[in-house]
Amino acid sequence: VQLIVTTDYSSMIEAMRHGRLDLAYFGPLSYVLAKQKSEIEPFAAIRQKGKTTYQAVVIANTSAGIDRIEDIAGKDVAFGDKASTSSHLIPKSMLAEKKLYAGQNYREHFVGAHDAVAMSVQNGHAQAGGLSKPIFETLVSRGMIKPEKVKVIAESEPFPQYPWTMRSDLDPQLKQKIKSAFMEINDPAILKPFKAEGFGAVTDKDYDVVRNLGSLLKLDLSKF
């Protein structure tokens, strides 16, 4: 097994498209984008508290006078990677539901990663931001983000977890062995880095909710 670590989602999507990867661990949106360019299929996602879903949060600097999403009007908002589900697509849709649109009602800034979003808000470079709830909770528990400086003002509905994917043209027997291997993992030492109880099965249809978000925000996903 050869491990390839890419610098961002776009480079991983390209690696999958050119057949340099057999398996890949995508975010929900980056999977949808990769699926448009290559024949891949999701087969497993981490299971936490019995679920293969997770949430995003919208956070705010405690001194910015923001108590609810509507208060973000006129502010600077930090997002992560443009191809990120929970640090871009989901929080942006939460703002859009309150009639707040980037470039019209607030200024958006892409800072690259979830932790960078939280740090930008904590440091006051942005008054609000969006990221994964599990990642935010980890940053707080590690002491990197101070609750007295950053607060959660909204949580999203549940969305499908980051999928493990494989090339669709792999040998069918190999594909089944890979799926079975993931589903049978129960060693705490292996699961600890994933902060997971185990893995659950997922399918392409589970990610239609992400595609629908793209439509809601009038995003041309082919240009990502």
Where is each model-derived feature located?
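Short helix-initiation/N-cap motifs at beta->coil->alpha
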Residues: 3-14, 102-119, 158
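Extracytoplasmic small-molecule ligand-binding "clamshell" domains
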Residues: 1-29
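Hydrophobic residues within well-ordered alpha-helices
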Residues: 16-17, 72, 121-122
